[in-house]
Amino acid sequence: TTTHFVPSMLAAFVASLTPENAACCKTLKQVFCSGEALPTGLCREWEQLTRAPLHNLYGPTEAAVDVSWYPAFGPELAAVEGNSVPIGFPVWNTGLRILDAMMRPVPFGVAGDLYLTGIQLAQGYLGRPDLTASRFIADPFAPGERMYRTGDVARWLDNGAVEYLGRSDDQLKIRGQRIELGEIDRAMLSLPDVAQ
């Protein structure tokens, strides 16, 4: 049996488990989490209660959803030092690039902007050529190819995994929905009775 949670739903599920009723999870062979940062403490609690392998997945809709993975159990989980599990390693046919403001690769451990490459990238945003042009850009390392600017800030870890550090813009998520604060600001300011 396999199941897939967003981390907040996994947290609610784990909160309902006790050592006695956790036996209901014994048939789980794999558990996947995606959609939000996956807290390290939650993974450790899950592992202690169930022993079912937990995998962290990462990826935006603009790139066929899941573009990286990280095993959130066993020795890999034990080695995690941060508050959330790394977003991990690229899946097949996917590239992860972490670049500085000059579009140069950053060294291990240095924060930069996360870009995605590969055949799974969307063509762009329907009816939004301006947004498409700003997010889907030419890949300076692969002539004729494109890459997607995620807006996520990340860094390379010593083991080659990628760690998510936050956002470089004012986007946030509420209940899994992307909220662009700049769009709300512009819409409010366009109203006749609103001033800043």
Label every model-predicted segment:
Residues 52-56, 71-196:
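AMP-dependent adenylate-forming
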Residues 9-10, 38, 121:
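Alpha-helix capping/helix-boundary segments
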Residues 2-4, 14-86, 95, 105:
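Gly/Ser/Thr-rich phosphate-binding loop
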Residues 8, 63, 177-179:
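Conserved catalytic/ATP-binding subdomain
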Residues 6-7, 184:
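Conserved glycosyltransferase catalytic-site signature
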